[in-house]
Amino acid sequence: MRSGEPACTMDQARGLDDAAARGGQCPGLGPAPTPTPPGRLGAPYSEAWGYFHLAPGRPGHPSGHWATCRLCGEQVGRGPGFHAGTSALWRHLRSAHRRELESSGAGSSPPAAPCPPPPGPAAAPEGDWARLLEQMGALAVRGSRRERELERRELAVEQGERALERRRRALQEEERAAAQARRELQAEREALQARLRDVSRREGALGWAPAAPPPLKDDPEGDRDGCVITKVLL
């Protein structure tokens, strides 16, 4: 192994592989987070990286294009990016460290972790929490009753307003009928007054006319000796 490069035992590599392969999903749980190699946050991690680490840059070769095997210290060209060159890392491991791979079980998926037991039924509240819930329930019931009482009062007020509106309209009709009756009575009174004035004029005209002469009376002694005496009243 070259100097300055960290060494890694098979147990440490196997632990990294187990951590990388652990990601079984359970109902209701999200996927397990995927580990990432040092210095590259968010990049997918392959089990092969448990046996390699990035080699420092060399003259003519940019940093990140070479990976150093933790088992033998050999540098393997992998190309830029963490997705590129993973097959080259696996080829090196299968060709140079097949025995270690078989003994560690790398490349095979470990059994998924058991799912946590489902949550049991919620325990009944006790103490202050129970009293608080009871008070909240009582307040809710009281508020509901208050709302119903207010609704009944509003309905009664609306009914009273409608009754008052009907009464007001009836009074307006009565006032219009009374006004019509007053107009009719006024017309009749004026007609009677006109007739009275006409009768008064007629009576006045009759009072100024000359009196008619009384009728002539027959004198029983007027017919004497065959003479007719005519009495003239002056």
UniProtKB/Swiss-Prot annotation:
Induction annotation: Induced in blood plasma by hyperglycemia. Decreased in blood plasma by hyperinsulinemia.
Pfam family, one: zf-BED
Location of the protein in the cell: Cytoplasm; Membrane; Secreted
Region named Disordered: 19-42, 94-126, 202-225
Transmembrane parts of this sequence: none
InterPro entries noted in UniProt: ZBED2/3, Znf_BED, Znf_C2H2_sf
GO biological process, one term: positive regulation of canonical Wnt signaling pathway
Pro residues composition-biased segments: 111-122
Alphabetized PROSITE patterns for the sequence: ZF_BED
Superkingdom per UniProt: Eukaryota
An annotated GO cellular component: chromatin
Tissue: Secreted in blood plasma, and expressed in skeletal muscle and adipose tissue (at protein level).
Zinc finger (BED-type): 43-104
Residues spanning the signal sequence: none
Residue positions binding Zn(2+): 69, 72, 92, 97
Basic and acidic residues: bias regions: 216-225
Main location: cytoplasm
Job description of the protein: Acts as a positive regulator in the activation of the canonical Wnt/beta-catenin signaling pathway by stabilizing cytoplasmic beta-catenin. Involved in transcription activation of Wnt target gene expression. Plays a role in symmetric division of blastomeres in the early stages of embryogenesis via regulation of mitotic spindle central positioning and organization of the F-actin filament network. Plays a role in regulating the distribution of cellular organelles, via modulation of cytoskeletal dynamics and cytoplasmic lattice formation.
Record text on subunit structure and interactions: Associates with the subcortical maternal complex (SCMC) composed of at least NLRP5, KHDC3L, OOEP, and TLE6 via interaction with NLRP5 and TLE6. Interacts with AXIN1; the interaction is direct, enhanced by protein kinase GSK3B and casein kinase CSNK1E activities and decreases GSK3B-induced beta-catenin serine and threonine phosphorylations.
Name of the protein this chain belongs to: Zinc finger BED domain-containing protein 3
Organism: Homo sapiens
Protein encoded by which gene: ZBED3
